[in-house]
Amino acid sequence: MGGLEPCSRLLLLPLLLAVSGLRPVQAQAQSDCSCSTVSPGVLAGIVMGDLVLTVLIALAVYFLGRLVPRGRGAAEAATRKQRITETESPYQELQGQRSDVYSDLNTQRPYYK
């Protein structure tokens, strides 16, 4: 085992655990239940299958993520910023104080006192 890589050791561990205990796993508290017993080999197979499936999903996400184009570069960001400054603002510019707009409101004020 000294020459194996750490990844190989991880994959070998469930296999060794399955081989070491070949008798079925039984519940000690409930010996008369109608449950089916699961052997250590089946448990190791489930764990190994789960690990393999997880690695496959991670690899698929990684490779599919590499197919998507990267974010915009600095040149495109500069053009976008320039395009934003060139567009006209949809908001009206602020003007000085205009008293004629609200002058009719002052005539109604005495009614609200």
From Swiss-Prot:
Following ligand binding by associated receptors, tyrosine phosphorylated in the ITAM domain which leads to activation of additional tyrosine kinases and subsequent cell activation. Residues 75-113 are annotated as: Disordered. Changing D50A: Reduced cell surface expression of KIR2DS1. Severely impairs formation of homotrimers and homotetramers. Abolishes interaction with TREM2 and stabilization of TREM2-CTF. Impairs the expression of KLRD1-KLRC2 on the cell surface. Ca(2+) binds at D50. Residues 62-113 are cytoplasmic. The chain crosses the membrane at residues 41-61. Residues 87-113 have a biased composition (Polar residues). Changing G45L: Does not significantly alter the formation of homotrimers or homotetramers. The record marks T54 as: Important for interaction with transmembrane receptors. Residues 80-108 form the ITAM domain. Residues 22-40 are extracellular. Changing V47A: Found in patients with early-onset Alzheimer disease; uncertain significance. Keywords: Calcium, Cell membrane, Disulfide bond, Immunity, Membrane, Metal-binding, Phosphoprotein, Signal, Transmembrane, Transmembrane helix. Expressed at low levels in the early development of the hematopoietic system and in the promonocytic stage and at high levels in mature monocytes. Expressed in hematological cells and tissues such as peripheral blood leukocytes and spleen. Also found in bone marrow, lymph nodes, placenta, lung and liver. Expressed at lower levels in different parts of the brain especially in the basal ganglia and corpus callosum. The keyword Cell membrane applies. Adapter protein which non-covalently associates with activating receptors found on the surface of a variety of immune cells to mediate signaling and cell activation following ligand binding by the receptors. TYROBP is tyrosine-phosphorylated in the ITAM domain following ligand binding by the associated receptors which leads to activation of additional tyrosine kinases and subsequent cell activation. Also has an inhibitory role in some cells. Non-covalently associates with activating receptors of the CD300 family to mediate cell activation. It is linked to Polycystic lipomembranous osteodysplasia with sclerosing leukoencephalopathy 1: A recessively inherited disease characterized by presenile dementia along with large-scale destruction of cancellous bones. Initial symptoms, starting in the twenties, are pain and swelling resulting from cysts in the wrists and ankles. Extremity bone fractures could occur with minor trauma. At around 30 years of age, patients gradually develop neuropsychiatric symptoms, including epileptic seizures, agnosia, apraxia, speech disorder, memory disturbance, euphoria, and loss of social inhibitions. This is TYRO protein tyrosine kinase-binding protein. The lineage of its organism: Eukaryota, Metazoa, Chordata, Craniata, Vertebrata.
